[in-house]
Amino acid sequence: MSSKVINQELKEAIQRKGMTQVTLSKGTFRAKTTINGYFRGDPAPVEAMEDMATYLDDSLFSQDMSHKVFSVIPPMRSDVYQQSPHTLDIIHKLETEERKSRKNRAMLLLTKNSEALTEQDKEEILDYALNFLDEVFIETRCIVSILEKVNLSLMSAVQQRVPHWKRQKYMGGE
């Protein structure tokens, strides 16, 4: 994996955390000049991004790094909508209604054998899945927004919840 420029994401993360470059340097066991270089725009290697994400324990920064390095789901930010739990819940409800309006048709289509699906059927199933993805994406951002109120990152919350999910048999493992 290659190094990436992350100066803007770092600036936003330490501002959210009320932290300084020196604190980040000490917490990640990296030279102050190295950390300062990342803030100036020097590319950061993947290992450094991982260490900083772990130390910062900031959901948006972690999502930013995952997106930059692995091209996974980007963090949701909007220049139009507030990122408050209330606003995100309203948007989530709208997305849920939109998905539900497509659900019955999609569920019927999903009962067909794959070879019997027409191109139109596949488009309707894809439309349903994409609307479902909208809903999940917004719901995830809503959870992050709620967790920010109690100063907990999404990853920390997931780590806390894994034992419960295992007891419920939602996931395997010891």
Residue map of PLM features:
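A short, Lys/Arg-rich alpha-helix, primarily the initiator
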Residues: M1-R16
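The alpha-helix within a helix-turn-helix
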Residues: I14, S25, A53
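Short alpha-helical "recognition helix" segments of helix-turn-helix
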Residues: T20-K26
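Recognition helix of helix-turn-helix/homeodomain-like DNA-binding domains
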Residues: F29-A44
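DNA major-groove recognition helix of helix-turn-helix/homeodomain DNA-binding modules
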Residues: E47-Q63
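Short, charged recognition helix plus adjacent turn
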Residues: M65-I91, A157-E174
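Helix-turn-helix/homeodomain-like alpha-helical modules used for DNA recognition
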Residues: S71-F137
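Charged, low-complexity intrinsically disordered regulatory/assembly segments
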Residues: E115-E174
